[in-house]
């Protein structure tokens, strides 16, 4: 009954439901040709914007993505190198790359799942504080204790 009322309000004839006469999903090839043209909506027209936003093609985003990949590849080589040659240079390199890798990864989770400007800004500020304390704590551990590499080796001996 509710669908019939809705279809009558939106102009469907003889009780036909609106979704039966209007395709909801269009193939990608058809949608590509219909960019920024009005499409029939529930009650009138709505604009479908399939083109990417103006900010998504920025150079900064591309460099950030490249930086994330470089850090990930560095970690693939740095972890075995730290196992084979544990020293303070490896400890500090691990502290920096692990903190940066974690910061960027959790930052993407915040961007994807935290909604609202104020809440997202607070979450990103909290993440920045957490990352700073993580890096400072790892550096403190490297300077005043055995370091990351030897600590992991000691854990493996247990």
Swiss-Prot record:
Pfam families: CybS. Residues 1-55 form a transit peptide. The chain crosses the membrane at residues 63-84, 90-110, 120-141. It is a multi-pass membrane protein. It is found in: Mitochondrion inner membrane. A ubiquinone binds at residue 113. It comes from the Eukaryota. The keyword Nucleotidyltransferase does not apply. One of its GO terms (biological process) is tricarboxylic acid cycle. Residues 85-89, 142-158 are mitochondrial intermembrane. Keywords: Electron transport, Heme, Iron, Membrane, Metal-binding, Mitochondrion, Mitochondrion inner membrane, Transit peptide, Transmembrane, Transmembrane helix, Transport, Tricarboxylic acid cycle. Pathway: Carbohydrate metabolism; tricarboxylic acid cycle. Its main location: mitochondrion. Heme b binds at residue 101. The keyword Transmembrane helix applies. GO terms for molecular function: heme binding; metal ion binding; ubiquinone binding. Belongs to the CybS family. This is Succinate dehydrogenase [ubiquinone] cytochrome b small subunit, mitochondrial. It comes from Bos taurus.
